[in-house]
A protein has these predicted regions:
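Extracytoplasmic beta-strand/coil segments of soluble accessory domains associated
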Residues: 55-76, 81, 93-132, 150
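Structural signature of Gram-negative outer-membrane beta-barrels, strongest in the C-terminal barrel
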Residues: 243-247, 365, 384-396, 432-550, ...
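Short acidic/polar hinge/loop motifs at secondary-structure boundaries
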Residues: 104, 115, 131-156, 174-176
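C-terminal beta-signal and adjacent terminal beta-strands/loops
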Residues: 640-648, 665-711
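Outer-membrane beta-barrel translocator/receptor signature
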Residues: 135, 147-150, 161-240, 244-251, ...
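Gram-negative outer-membrane beta-barrel transporters
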Residues: 450-452, 547, 566-649, 706-710
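Acidic/polar loop-and-plug regions of large Gram-negative outer-membrane beta-barrel proteins
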Residues: 222-226, 238-314, 329-365, 409-438, ...
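Membrane-embedded beta-barrel scaffold of Gram-negative outer-membrane proteins
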Residues: 312-326, 330-336, 497, 521-582, ...
Length: 711
């Protein structure tokens, strides 16, 4: 099996090599020819602009300044809107499937949110246009709609200097679609298996003849099923925005967003036996369509509103002032049932039945985030400085009341009977809000010497405070300094080796079983790598190796399962390879990740971290035909290798699997037609099994047809 998987990946890689070699041959031949001068009129790429194809050259994700990716001493991926569209990503987690250093969808079919692990860490933080989203996560949240974004940027490794509190593995920055000066309109309709139905619109352009007022409106409605029965999904989303350009030095954008999600629950927490292990009594594997809740009671979703603005003023040719503010309000609900199988390390007590646990929660969150940025450029002799000074804050008021209990009625996993559950009255009692505040001050200098050397240094101070209203428990009040240093050498032919050191800081709310507060979680990383992106060529290749250490990681107390100890320390050593390229009509992107993530001091010392594979790889290619008789046709295919992973303490493993995706599309004038297949061969697999006794099944085949009209 491994040989077949490696052969598939190698074959796809070799299939693309003649095109890349042809580019080199053409370049060499061109040196001996006198070519006609051609004037090209286009839009210069910026850190937030749309990108044609899959290759982005600039980003602000790593520095909060508009910087070439070659000059950032950190591993960063940019997933463009074209890639999201071509791969028909229906969630942020799906958009991350082909990125290096990311364990996407570790819980398989899970509609509770976007889950992924960066460099062996827990799910990374998410920021929207550089501003933090809720600081305290909870079940019942509304996760983001990928159609709304121009880019999804993955910043790997500690990023406290740039963003404040975040896990050491990294974070994801979502870049919203912005109003444009050129009028563009799109209407897109989708339909597919599992009753997938979706209509989306994206309109933008000027509102006046002078182009001082620009607008954008993004809207979507989705009414679909899932591979799990009774888990219907309904989403409504609108995002209007308006940009005012009173002069060439000033820009103000005001925006809003409303999203409402309603669905059944896809999560089942299925037992080992019947998923990863053989079912007892000669029964078959548990169906991936099994709904383990109650159709008339289970619900998951909520609504979210956002409103904010971004302001930019050029004070001079060298200095720019930026200010951003956003308010997020979210109200969720989560009523569900799942299998009571935690703690079982073998077959179920019965051949075909389990008991179920019921859960009800109503999380809420109000977050106000703001920042003030000053960027300046100073030149001294052979030195070019890009200075950045920033102040940011985030204030959140959240509640997460929940109750749960055990339903003693046995549930048949092979012939489920619904309607016998006596719905409980969820009494949440007195609800005490949690208030979280973060304030950070940062300074950074990007120094370029002789157009060859780039040195990046940054320093940040964070103050984080967490309190619970009407509670006698001790809150969190922590401060910390974080640093980053990096060096890049800009060699000839677009080659850029680099070294970097960075830190992370994250205050941990709550106490242990005995009432003692937790220390902040800290992380530090050493990274070395090479990037390659020739000037004027749509190529971007990056290679990185790193060692990341996380301190004060929480671990379960082996003597008291209800307690958590801060004895854990995790060391992650890894290697990542990622490349994006376009040659004429061929677009290719690929990645390979090696992650050795081990607990070095906890109760399961020396074992690979739960759900994190050591090896993973992916390759995607799209070819657009240019011949007259088939002009407008495109075909694409991708291979995803998901390596073997383990439950906590390596008590159970999940075998590796290889999945295939495919695309066929046709564009004629203003019309586009496409068909996407994900998990083309409908492979049934287990995504993850936890050491406590439960497993998650992977996503089955998805077929979606799309029709869009653009003008």
């Amino acid at each position: 099996m491994r040989a077949a998987q490696l052969f598939t990946l190698t074959t796809l890689a070799l299939a693309t090599s003649p095109y890349l070699q042809a580019e080199e041959d053409t370049t060499e031949t061109g040196r001996e020819q006198t070519l006609q001068t051609i004037t090209v009129i286009g839009t210069k790429e910026t850190a937030s602009s749309a990108v044609k194809g899959y290759v982005a050259k600039r980003s602000s994700a790593g520095t909060k300044t508009d910087t070439a990716l070659l000059e950032i001493p950190q591993s960063i991926s940019v997933i463009t809107a074209d890639q999201i569209k071509d791969q028909n990503a229906q969630s942020i987690s799906e958009a991350l499937r082909y990125s290096a250093g990311v364990t996407a969808e570790p819980y398989g079919v899970d509609n509770r949110g976007d889950y992924y692990a960066l460099r062996g860490g827990s799910s990374g933080s998410v920021v929207l246009d550089g501003l933090r989203l809720p600081l305290i996560g909870s079940w019942g949240s509304v996760h983001d709609e990928p159609y709304a974004f121009e880019r999804v940027e993955v910043i790997r490794g500690p990023s406290a200097v740039t963003y404040g509190q975040n896990p050491p593995g990294g974070l994801v920055n979502l870049v919203s679609k912005q109003p444009q000066k050129t009028a563009q309109h799109e209407i897109a309709i989708q339909g597919g298996n599992n009753d997938h139905r979706q209509v989306a619109v994206d309109f933008t352009g000027p509102l006046d003849q002078d182009g001082t007022l620009l607008y954008r409106f993004v809207g979507l409605t989705n009414n679909s099923g899932r591979q799990v029965e009774y888990a219907k999904v309904r989403r409504d989303y609108i995002a209007p925005s308006l940009t005012w350009l009173p002069d060439s030095k000033t820009k103000l954008t005001i925006y809003g967003q409303y999203q409402k999600d309603e669905s059944g629950n896809t999560n089942a927490f299925l037992p080992w036996a019947g998923t990863r292990l053989d079912a007892p009594g000669g029964y078959p594997k548990i169906s991936s369509r099994l709904f383990i809740g109650e159709p008339d009671w289970d619900s998951y979703g909520g609504q979210r509103t956002r409103i904010g603005y971004s302001f930019e003023r050029k004070l001079s040719d060298d200095w720019t002032l930026r200010q951003n503010l956003r308010h997020d309000n979210a109200n969720g609900h989560y009523t569900t049932m799942y299998a009571d199988c935690c703690g079982w390390m073998g077959p179920r007590p019965s051949d075909r039945t389990v008991n179920r646990v019921w859960y009800a929660g109503q999380p809420t969150s109000d977050v106000t985030s703001a920042d003030l940025q000053l960027e300046g450029k100073l030149n001294f002799a052979r030195f070019e400085h890009t200075l950045f000074f920033g102040v940011d804050s985030a204030q959140e008021r959240s509640t997460n009341p929940s109750v749960s209990g055990l339903d003693p009625t046995p549930f048949d996993l092979y012939a489920p009977v619904y309607g016998r559950f006596a719905e409980p009255v969820a009494d949440f009692g007195v609800i005490s809000p949690t208030r979280t505040t973060q304030v950070g001050i940062s300074v950074q200098d990007q120094i370029k010497f002789d157009h060859r050397w780039v040195f990046v240094a940054g320093l940040r101070h964070d103050h984080a405070k967490v309190t619970v209203d009407d509670s006698a428990s001790v809150g969190v009040d922590e401060s910390a300094w974080s640093r980053r240093f990096g060096l890049v050498y800009l060699a000839d032919h677009g080659l850029a080796p680099y070294l970097s050191y960075s830190q992370s800081f994250e205050a941990l709310a709550g106490t242990d079983f005995y009432g003692q507060t937790f220390k902040p979680k800290r992380g530090e990383q050493y990274e070395a790598g090479v990037k390659w992106s020739p000037i004027g060529k749509p190529y971007m290749l990056s290679i990185a190796t790193f060692q990341l250490k996380e301190k004060n990681r929480l671990s379960t107390d082996p003597n008291n399962p209800q307690n958590q100890l801060q004895l854990g320390e995790v060391t992650v050593k890894g290697f990542e390879l990622e490349g994006n390229a376009r040659y004429q009509n061929l677009e290719v992107l690929g990645s390979y990740t090696y992650t050795n993530a081990r607990d070095t001091t906890g109760p399961v010392k020396g074992t690979q971290l739960e759900s994190i594979p050591k090896h993973s790889a992916s390759l995607w290619a799209k070819y657009s035909f240019a011949l007259a008789d088939i002009s407008g046709f495109s075909v694409g295919s991708g291979v995803r290798y998901l390596g073997r992973n383990w439950g906590e303490g390596a008590v159970i493993d999940v075998p590796a699997t290889t999945l295939v995706d495919a695309l066929a599309s046709y564009t004629q004038d203003k019309w586009s037609f496409s068909l996407n297949a994900k998990n083309l061969f409908d492979k049934e697999y287990v995504a993850t099994c936890l050491g406590r006794g439960d497993c998650w099944l992977g996503t089955r085949r998805s077929l979606v047809g799309s029709v869009s009209y653009r003008w």
